[in-house]
Amino acid sequence: HRERCTALHGVPTMFIAELNHPMFDMFDLSSLRTGIMAGAPCPIETMKQVMDKMYCKEIISVYGLTEASPGMTASRVTDSMEIRATTVGCAFPNVEVKVLDPATNKECPPGTPGEMCCKGYNIMKGYYKNPEATAAIIDENGFLHSGDLGVMDENGYFRITGRIKEMIIRGGENIYPREIENFLYKMPQIEAVEVAGIPSPKYGEEVGAFIKIKEGSSLTEEEVRLYCRGQIARYKIPKYIFFVDGYPMTASGKIQKYKLKDVGLRLLKEKGVEVI
Protein backbone atom coordinates (compact mmCIF):
# COMPACT_ATOMS: atom_id res chain seq x y z
CA HIS A 1 0.00 0.00 0.00
CA ARG A 2 2.46 2.65 1.21
CA GLU A 3 5.51 1.35 -0.68
CA ARG A 4 3.52 0.54 -3.86
CA CYS A 5 4.84 -3.02 -3.93
CA THR A 6 4.42 -5.00 -7.14
CA ALA A 7 4.91 -8.56 -5.84
CA LEU A 8 3.52 -10.47 -2.88
CA HIS A 9 4.71 -13.92 -1.79
CA GLY A 10 3.23 -16.19 0.87
CA VAL A 11 1.58 -19.42 1.90
CA PRO A 12 -2.18 -19.87 1.41
CA THR A 13 -3.07 -19.20 5.06
CA MET A 14 -1.39 -15.79 4.81
CA PHE A 15 -3.33 -14.84 1.69
CA ILE A 16 -6.59 -16.09 3.25
CA ALA A 17 -5.97 -13.96 6.34
CA GLU A 18 -5.23 -10.91 4.19
CA LEU A 19 -8.32 -11.39 2.02
CA ASN A 20 -10.52 -11.65 5.11
CA HIS A 21 -8.91 -8.83 7.08
CA PRO A 22 -11.64 -6.45 8.35
CA MET A 23 -9.73 -3.46 6.91
CA PHE A 24 -8.96 -5.11 3.56
CA ASP A 25 -11.04 -2.65 1.53
CA MET A 26 -9.19 0.32 3.03
CA PHE A 27 -5.91 -0.59 1.33
CA ASP A 28 -4.99 0.33 -2.23
CA LEU A 29 -3.45 -2.82 -3.71
CA SER A 30 -3.61 -1.73 -7.33
CA SER A 31 0.21 -1.64 -7.60
CA LEU A 32 0.39 -5.41 -7.09
CA ARG A 33 1.07 -7.38 -10.23
CA THR A 34 2.61 -10.74 -9.40
CA GLY A 35 3.73 -13.02 -6.59
CA ILE A 36 4.29 -16.60 -5.54
CA MET A 37 1.84 -18.91 -3.79
CA ALA A 38 3.74 -21.76 -2.15
CA GLY A 39 4.27 -23.75 1.04
CA ALA A 40 0.98 -25.68 0.96
CA PRO A 41 -1.78 -26.59 -1.50
CA CYS A 42 -3.86 -23.51 -2.27
CA PRO A 43 -7.67 -23.65 -2.50
CA ILE A 44 -8.78 -22.83 -6.04
CA GLU A 45 -11.19 -20.14 -4.84
CA THR A 46 -8.42 -18.44 -2.85
CA MET A 47 -6.13 -18.32 -5.88
CA LYS A 48 -8.88 -16.73 -7.96
CA GLN A 49 -9.58 -14.14 -5.24
CA VAL A 50 -5.89 -13.22 -5.04
CA MET A 51 -5.91 -12.60 -8.79
CA ASP A 52 -9.16 -10.62 -8.75
CA LYS A 53 -9.25 -8.79 -5.41
CA MET A 54 -5.52 -8.31 -4.83
CA TYR A 55 -4.70 -7.51 -8.48
CA CYS A 56 -2.02 -10.23 -8.64
CA LYS A 57 -2.97 -11.18 -12.19
CA GLU A 58 0.46 -12.73 -12.80
CA ILE A 59 0.77 -14.71 -9.56
CA ILE A 60 2.14 -18.23 -9.96
CA SER A 61 2.17 -21.40 -7.87
CA VAL A 62 5.43 -23.07 -6.89
CA TYR A 63 5.54 -26.58 -5.45
CA GLY A 64 8.36 -28.33 -3.67
CA LEU A 65 9.92 -28.98 -0.30
CA THR A 66 13.01 -27.91 1.61
CA GLU A 67 14.89 -31.01 0.48
CA ALA A 68 14.35 -29.88 -3.13
CA SER A 69 15.94 -26.46 -2.59
CA PRO A 70 12.91 -25.87 -2.26
CA GLY A 71 11.10 -26.12 -5.62
CA MET A 72 10.16 -28.83 -8.12
CA THR A 73 7.41 -27.34 -10.27
CA ALA A 74 6.03 -23.90 -11.09
CA SER A 75 3.34 -22.39 -13.23
CA ARG A 76 4.13 -19.55 -15.63
CA VAL A 77 2.68 -16.06 -15.88
CA THR A 78 1.72 -16.94 -19.45
CA ASP A 79 -0.45 -19.84 -18.27
CA SER A 80 -4.17 -19.20 -18.14
CA MET A 81 -5.79 -18.14 -14.88
CA GLU A 82 -7.51 -21.53 -14.70
CA ILE A 83 -4.22 -23.44 -15.00
CA ARG A 84 -2.50 -21.26 -12.41
CA ALA A 85 -5.45 -21.65 -10.04
CA THR A 86 -5.85 -25.41 -10.38
CA THR A 87 -2.29 -26.73 -10.88
CA VAL A 88 1.23 -26.20 -9.56
CA GLY A 89 2.60 -25.95 -13.08
CA CYS A 90 5.27 -28.04 -14.80
CA ALA A 91 8.65 -29.39 -13.73
CA PHE A 92 11.55 -26.94 -13.43
CA PRO A 93 13.97 -26.97 -16.40
CA ASN A 94 16.53 -29.80 -16.14
CA VAL A 95 14.60 -31.34 -13.25
CA GLU A 96 12.77 -34.67 -13.54
CA VAL A 97 9.43 -34.94 -11.76
CA LYS A 98 7.44 -38.16 -11.79
CA VAL A 99 4.25 -39.43 -10.17
CA LEU A 100 5.11 -42.87 -8.77
CA ASP A 101 2.80 -45.56 -7.42
CA PRO A 102 3.59 -45.74 -3.66
CA ALA A 103 3.05 -49.50 -3.67
CA THR A 104 5.17 -50.45 -6.72
CA ASN A 105 7.42 -47.40 -7.24
CA LYS A 106 6.43 -47.51 -10.94
CA GLU A 107 5.49 -44.37 -12.85
CA CYS A 108 1.77 -43.62 -12.98
CA PRO A 109 0.19 -42.76 -16.34
CA PRO A 110 -1.29 -39.26 -16.81
CA GLY A 111 -4.47 -38.80 -14.81
CA THR A 112 -3.57 -41.43 -12.21
CA PRO A 113 -2.73 -40.23 -8.67
CA GLY A 114 0.52 -41.23 -7.00
CA GLU A 115 3.43 -39.83 -5.02
CA MET A 116 5.22 -36.72 -6.29
CA CYS A 117 8.92 -37.58 -6.74
CA CYS A 118 11.82 -35.52 -8.06
CA LYS A 119 15.36 -36.03 -9.32
CA GLY A 120 17.84 -33.35 -10.36
CA TYR A 121 20.41 -30.73 -9.42
CA ASN A 122 18.02 -29.29 -6.84
CA ILE A 123 17.84 -32.38 -4.63
CA MET A 124 19.78 -32.34 -1.36
CA LYS A 125 22.77 -34.64 -0.88
CA GLY A 126 21.20 -35.94 2.31
CA TYR A 127 20.32 -35.22 5.91
CA TYR A 128 23.38 -34.25 7.95
CA LYS A 129 24.92 -37.34 9.56
CA ASN A 130 21.67 -39.27 9.15
CA PRO A 131 22.03 -41.83 6.34
CA GLU A 132 19.00 -43.81 7.52
CA ALA A 133 16.67 -40.83 7.14
CA THR A 134 18.25 -40.01 3.78
CA ALA A 135 17.71 -43.56 2.49
CA ALA A 136 14.08 -43.40 3.60
CA ILE A 137 13.32 -40.38 1.39
CA ILE A 138 15.71 -40.77 -1.59
CA ASP A 139 15.38 -44.08 -3.44
CA GLU A 140 18.06 -46.11 -5.22
CA ASN A 141 17.29 -44.29 -8.48
CA GLY A 142 17.97 -40.89 -6.94
CA PHE A 143 14.34 -39.78 -6.72
CA LEU A 144 13.28 -37.76 -3.70
CA HIS A 145 9.92 -38.99 -2.37
CA SER A 146 7.84 -36.05 -1.21
CA GLY A 147 5.04 -37.84 0.64
CA ASP A 148 2.58 -35.71 -1.37
CA LEU A 149 -0.12 -37.15 -3.58
CA GLY A 150 -0.33 -35.65 -7.03
CA VAL A 151 -1.46 -36.26 -10.58
CA MET A 152 -0.01 -35.17 -13.92
CA ASP A 153 -2.16 -34.31 -16.91
CA GLU A 154 -1.46 -34.97 -20.58
CA ASN A 155 0.31 -31.60 -20.93
CA GLY A 156 2.75 -32.14 -18.07
CA TYR A 157 0.96 -29.97 -15.52
CA PHE A 158 0.83 -31.29 -11.97
CA ARG A 159 -1.97 -31.04 -9.43
CA ILE A 160 -1.47 -31.78 -5.73
CA THR A 161 -4.30 -33.79 -4.20
CA GLY A 162 -3.04 -34.12 -0.63
CA ARG A 163 -0.61 -35.96 1.61
CA ILE A 164 -0.32 -39.75 1.54
CA LYS A 165 -0.67 -39.85 5.33
CA GLU A 166 -3.63 -37.45 5.22
CA MET A 167 -5.71 -39.55 2.82
CA ILE A 168 -8.90 -40.72 4.52
CA ILE A 169 -9.90 -44.36 4.06
CA ARG A 170 -13.58 -44.79 4.90
CA GLY A 171 -14.90 -48.31 4.52
CA GLY A 172 -12.31 -49.04 1.83
CA GLU A 173 -12.98 -45.82 -0.12
CA ASN A 174 -10.03 -43.45 -0.62
CA ILE A 175 -11.01 -39.86 0.12
CA TYR A 176 -8.74 -36.91 -0.63
CA PRO A 177 -9.30 -34.06 1.86
CA ARG A 178 -8.33 -31.36 -0.61
CA GLU A 179 -11.15 -32.33 -2.99
CA ILE A 180 -13.72 -31.71 -0.25
CA GLU A 181 -11.95 -28.54 0.91
CA ASN A 182 -11.99 -27.06 -2.59
CA PHE A 183 -15.70 -27.81 -2.84
CA LEU A 184 -16.59 -26.28 0.54
CA TYR A 185 -14.55 -23.15 -0.19
CA LYS A 186 -17.26 -22.23 -2.68
CA MET A 187 -19.64 -21.54 0.21
CA PRO A 188 -19.59 -17.75 0.69
CA GLN A 189 -19.83 -18.05 4.48
CA ILE A 190 -16.60 -20.04 4.79
CA GLU A 191 -13.30 -18.25 5.41
CA ALA A 192 -11.20 -21.41 5.80
CA VAL A 193 -11.76 -25.16 5.94
CA GLU A 194 -9.59 -28.16 6.68
CA VAL A 195 -10.72 -31.77 6.28
CA ALA A 196 -9.24 -34.67 8.25
CA GLY A 197 -10.07 -38.26 9.15
CA ILE A 198 -11.77 -39.00 12.47
CA PRO A 199 -11.45 -42.59 13.81
CA SER A 200 -14.54 -44.77 13.40
CA PRO A 201 -15.05 -48.30 14.81
CA LYS A 202 -17.38 -49.12 11.89
CA TYR A 203 -15.66 -47.58 8.84
CA GLY A 204 -12.10 -47.06 10.08
CA GLU A 205 -12.38 -43.32 9.49
CA GLU A 206 -15.10 -40.74 8.98
CA VAL A 207 -14.76 -37.36 7.28
CA GLY A 208 -14.40 -34.40 9.61
CA ALA A 209 -14.57 -30.78 8.41
CA PHE A 210 -13.06 -28.00 10.53
CA ILE A 211 -14.66 -24.77 9.36
CA LYS A 212 -13.79 -21.17 10.14
CA ILE A 213 -16.76 -18.91 9.38
CA LYS A 214 -16.29 -15.46 7.90
CA GLU A 215 -16.83 -12.59 10.30
CA GLY A 216 -20.44 -11.44 10.17
CA SER A 217 -21.66 -14.71 8.62
CA SER A 218 -23.51 -17.63 10.16
CA LEU A 219 -23.59 -21.29 9.23
CA THR A 220 -25.01 -24.52 10.65
CA GLU A 221 -23.94 -28.13 10.29
CA GLU A 222 -27.14 -28.95 8.42
CA GLU A 223 -26.58 -26.11 5.94
CA VAL A 224 -23.13 -27.52 5.15
CA ARG A 225 -24.52 -31.01 4.59
CA LEU A 226 -27.37 -29.71 2.43
CA TYR A 227 -24.84 -27.83 0.31
CA CYS A 228 -22.91 -31.07 -0.22
CA ARG A 229 -25.91 -33.28 -0.91
CA GLY A 230 -26.17 -34.20 -4.56
CA GLN A 231 -22.95 -32.34 -5.39
CA ILE A 232 -20.33 -34.74 -4.03
CA ALA A 233 -20.49 -38.47 -3.32
CA ARG A 234 -22.41 -39.34 -0.14
CA TYR A 235 -19.42 -41.01 1.48
CA LYS A 236 -17.44 -37.76 1.06
CA ILE A 237 -19.99 -35.62 2.91
CA PRO A 238 -18.52 -34.76 6.33
CA LYS A 239 -20.10 -36.72 9.16
CA TYR A 240 -18.50 -34.43 11.70
CA ILE A 241 -18.53 -30.66 11.25
CA PHE A 242 -16.61 -28.50 13.69
CA PHE A 243 -16.79 -24.71 13.73
CA VAL A 244 -13.42 -23.41 14.90
CA ASP A 245 -11.68 -20.08 15.45
CA GLY A 246 -8.36 -21.27 14.03
CA TYR A 247 -6.03 -24.19 13.38
CA PRO A 248 -2.81 -25.56 14.89
CA MET A 249 -0.03 -23.81 12.97
CA THR A 250 3.71 -23.98 12.48
CA ALA A 251 5.87 -20.92 13.06
CA SER A 252 5.98 -20.39 9.27
CA GLY A 253 2.20 -20.24 8.93
CA LYS A 254 1.49 -23.78 7.73
CA ILE A 255 -1.47 -25.69 9.14
CA GLN A 256 -0.55 -28.79 11.14
CA LYS A 257 -3.27 -31.00 9.70
CA TYR A 258 -2.01 -34.10 11.52
CA LYS A 259 -3.14 -32.52 14.80
CA LEU A 260 -6.74 -32.08 13.65
CA LYS A 261 -7.70 -35.67 14.48
CA ASP A 262 -6.95 -35.05 18.16
CA VAL A 263 -8.72 -31.69 18.01
CA GLY A 264 -11.79 -33.41 16.57
CA LEU A 265 -11.76 -36.17 19.17
CA ARG A 266 -11.51 -33.59 21.95
CA LEU A 267 -14.41 -31.55 20.57
CA LEU A 268 -16.55 -34.67 20.19
CA LYS A 269 -15.74 -35.73 23.75
CA GLU A 270 -16.82 -32.29 24.98
CA LYS A 271 -20.16 -32.94 23.24
CA GLY A 272 -20.41 -36.35 24.92
CA VAL A 273 -19.78 -38.25 21.68
CA GLU A 274 -17.45 -41.26 21.96
CA VAL A 275 -16.11 -42.55 18.64
CA ILE A 276 -13.29 -44.87 19.78
Protein language model regions, located:
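AMP-binding/adenylate-forming catalytic core of the ANL superfamily
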Residues: 1, 8, 21, 120, ...
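Gly/Ser/Thr-rich phosphate-binding loop
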Residues: 2-10, 19-83, 96
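Active-site glycine-centered loops adjacent to acidic/histidine catalytic or metal-binding residues
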Residues: 39, 64, 89, 148, ...
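Adenylate-forming AMP-binding core of the ANL superfamily, especially NRPS adenylation
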Residues: 41, 81-129, 137
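Beta-strand->loop->alpha-helix junctions that form or flank phosphate-binding loops
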Residues: 59-67, 87-91, 196-199, 242
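Active-site and channel-lining beta-strand-loop segments
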Residues: 96-103, 244-252
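Acidic/polar alpha-helix N-cap and adjacent early helical turns
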Residues: 262-276
